[in-house]
């Protein structure tokens, strides 16, 4: 019997997948526990359309991320911070401040978790900051830190 899984079932498949199982297993275990429903042509067609829509959505997100990455690669931001005579900042610049400056100066809203800094910036100078926008899409942004 063909069934469509409503949840992930260990050893059988993931949610929304169509699998072939024994009739008794489907009727006595999967269907009563609402883990699966019998597969019909309409349901299979609906699942196929849903997967195609998800694929198109992922492709759009990937294109948007690539477009944003190319814009960020060409851009740079300048952050002014209080610093001592030897170029050491009072405090530090974290990925949160970089995300805020990107929004303020460039107009792009980027989640601070996507900005990769090994350590907060503590000295005046120029830095290449890595931003992971999407799976496999990485941008490097020039960040110039100056004394205010």
Swiss-Prot record:
Keywords: Ribonucleoprotein, Ribosomal protein, RNA-binding, rRNA-binding. It holds the Pfam family Ribosomal_L9_C. One of its GO terms (molecular function) is rRNA binding. InterPro entries: Ribosomal_bL9, Ribosomal_bL9/RNase_H1_N, Ribosomal_bL9_bac/chp, Ribosomal_bL9_C, Ribosomal_bL9_C_sf, Ribosomal_bL9_N, Ribosomal_bL9_N_sf. One of its GO terms (cellular component) is ribosome. Gene3D superfamilies: Ribosomal protein L9, C-terminal domain (3.10.430.100), Ribosomal protein L9, N-terminal domain (3.40.5.10). GO terms for biological process: translation. Binds to the 23S rRNA. HAMAP family: Ribosomal_bL9. Belongs to the bacterial ribosomal protein bL9 family. PANTHER family: 50S RIBOSOMAL PROTEIN L9 (PTHR21368). This is Large ribosomal subunit protein bL9. It comes from Caldicellulosiruptor bescii (strain ATCC BAA-1888 / DSM 6725 / KCTC 15123 / Z-1320) (Anaerocellum thermophilum). The gene is rplI.
